[in-house]
A protein has these predicted regions:
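Acidic, Ala/Val/Gly-enriched low-complexity intrinsically disordered segments
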Residues: 8-9, 25
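Hydrophobic alpha-helical elements and their junctions with loops/disorder across both membrane
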Residues: 15-16, 141
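Residue-level recognition of conserved structural "scaffold" positions that shape functional pockets
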Residues: 17-19, 186
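Small-residue-enriched flexible segments
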Residues: 28-80, 84-85, 89-305
Length: 305
């Protein structure tokens, strides 16, 4: 596998969740509202037709870890949306309207006229690996009429590549799957995810959208500038990188970072790797989840085979 030590320099803030576009036919009304919770106060911004708090089917919550750790934060959200399925996911920055927020909570409330939604969750601790956890998670969603699966996962304990493989195997090629891994700001310690409960580490949640009255498309865009020479990975295991061209990967990474190496692991957010996977249509950016000084290894959000 060929990589650029990206040392892709960061142009934009790096978020874990790709943009998603829910397109509905004219006979299926979709109502969407955006909420911001900060300092014990709620603010509302209507995205399309107003989604009523009491009738919202699904509420997607993204927040700073400090906010999601507060006892009773789930109860605060549930009080606002009593009938909704509620997902919660920690971030490295929350987007509200056109601005990036930190240490707050942003909630997206969705309400459909004809589309039904089912949800499911698993704990990675109950499964041998991320692939098995994905199989179990997808198996909890009814298959009949399934159109789309939105997934949010622990970002420290889960291998994103294996998660996607398992989900796609169960759902099949005709069902779109998008989502992302939870963030932890610049701390690299633990992430929080929850479904209809106080969020906790190790959780993976999914929301399935059903019926022919909805069409889903998706897109993503990166903002990285690539620099550094192309090099070949010579030793790795799944999403753990050990050697690049027979050199210790962590030491080589630190060499490229220069003074920024002193700020690891936080500075790793600014310098992911640009990876060319054999047989893949195009290269991917791999975000670093952690570094291990004893093993001299680096763990990424997805495979670096």
């Amino acid at each position: 596998m060929i990589i650029n030590l990206i040392f892709a320099a960061r142009k934009w803030h790096n978020f874990n969740i790709n943009p998603l576009y829910l397109t509905y036919v004219q006979t299926n009304i979709m109502q969407t509202s955006l909420f911001h919770y900060c300092g014990s106060e709620w603010k509302k911004h209507t995205v399309s037709q107003l989604a009523e708090n009491t009738n919202a089917q699904l509420v997607l919550c993204f927040g700073g870890k400090e906010v999601l750790q507060k006892p009773g934060i789930y109860a605060v959200v549930k009080e606002q949306f009593p009938a909704a399925e509620i997902t919660m996911c920690s971030t490295a920055g929350e987007i509200y309207q056109d601005a990036v927020q930190e240490n707050s909570l942003v909630a997206v409330a969705l309400q459909f006229e004809k589309t039904t939604i089912n949800t499911a969750s698993v704990n990675i601790a109950d499964h041998q690996n991320s692939y098995d956890a994905a199989l179990a998670l997808a198996g909890k969603l009814p298959n009949k009429g399934l159109k789309y699966v939105m997934v949010f996962s622990d970002g420290r304990l889960v291998n994103g590549s294996e998660l996607v493989k398992g989900l796609n195997l169960v759902t099949g090629k005709d069902v779109l799957v998008t989502g992302g891994l939870a963030g932890d700001g610049a701390d690299f310690k633990s992430t929080l995810v929850g479904l209809n409960e106080q969020p906790a580490p190790g959780k993976i949640v999914a929301a399935g959208f059903y019926g022919d009255a909805i069409t889903i498309t998706h897109g993503s865009q990166g903002g990285w500038d690539i620099f550094g020479l192309e090099k070949e990975i010579t030793r790795s295991e799944s999403n753990v990188l050990f050697e690049i061209e027979n050199q210790n990967a962590l030491e080589l990474y630190k060499k490229y970072l220069g003074p920024e190496a002193a700020n690891l692991p936080a500075s790793a957010l600014l310098f992911p790797l640009y990876v060319t996977i054999p047989g893949a249509a195009k290269p991917v950016v791999r975000t670093i989840l952690s570094i291990d000084e004893e093993r001299k290894s680096m763990t990424f959000a997805g495979d670096v085979p």
